[in-house]
């Protein structure tokens, strides 16, 4: 997921996306532990997407404080 796509979403949409990404990460980790053949980088990419979403949400929160 691109940062441009993330920045174009509203804060509510980002919170929903964050929740779904966290669920997806849990599922991916569990599947990886069960199968032992899962792709490690898939989990890494989900974690990076979560970090991007959290970064944008925190930036918006800081902007609200300063306005």
UniProtKB/Swiss-Prot annotation:
Q: Which GO terms describe its molecular function?
A: structural constituent of ribosome
GO BP term (any one): translation
Asked if the record carries the keyword Ribosomal protein, the reply is yes
Transport as UniProt keyword: no
**Any one cellular-component term (Gene Ontology):** ribosome
Q: Which NCBIfam families match?
A: L29
Listed name of the protein: Large ribosomal subunit protein uL29
């Amino acid at each position: 997921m691109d940062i441009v796509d993330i920045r174009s979403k509203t804060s509510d949409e980002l919170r929903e996306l964050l929740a779904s990404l966290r669920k997806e990460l849990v599922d991916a980790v569990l599947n990886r532990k069960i199968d032992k053949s899962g792709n490690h980088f898939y989990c890494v990419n989900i974690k990076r997407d979560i970090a991007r979403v959290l970064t944008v949400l925190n930036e918006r929160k800081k902007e609200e404080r300063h306005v």
